[in-house]
């Protein structure tokens, strides 16, 4: 699978500030991983980590940085395409002296296809992906049959994908996709205490949006 012809994200609204650009330019070579069409060795990147978790889409990076800080024994690879968020997360890495978090600027589909070895990820976090609420845009949602087929071989035996969304129709769609697959087992769970409530999530809660956490284990 190359980069999908129908993207699950939009670059609109990705205006980067001077501070974010400066952080991105200065820090990406140190705390980022450059995209390559060759597999990377996660054991070399995170030699002291008990587990390696991929964060797909991280907004402005607040939750990702908190999770990495609170779980120093895990290694985290954060993948996104939006320059402002990448610059902000790189700055957070420095501010919090995080040695267990790396950033990749690229479409996660091609990152998984080319860079991530099979059975090398202990888990995947997919928190608040774009729900694409308009029916004509539903095909742009990241969670679909092809996505499950892509991530399944990359996850270790007993590994997981944890998804959270505050858009109920999307939560229902996600559950339908997984229910139709034999690759994963699981369903809705209680929000774990370790997952921070981001500003974006808080805004949704203020609007009475119901947040659904879902956990699926590799079958």
Describe the role of every protein-language-model region.
Residues 82:
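Conserved SAM/SAH-binding beta-strand->alpha-helix loop
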Residues 157-165:
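Conserved beta-strand signature within the Rossmann-like core of class I S-adenosyl-L-methionine
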Residues 1-54, 65-69, 90-118:
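S-adenosyl-L-methionine
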Residues 171-219:
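Class I S-adenosyl-L-methionine
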Residues 143-157:
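A short glycine-rich, Lys/Arg-flanked "PGG" loop and its adjoining helix->strand segment in the class I
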Residues 57-61:
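Class I SAM-dependent methyltransferase "Motif I" SAM/SAH-binding loop
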Residues 86-88, 171:
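Short alpha-helix immediately C-terminal to the canonical SAM-binding loop
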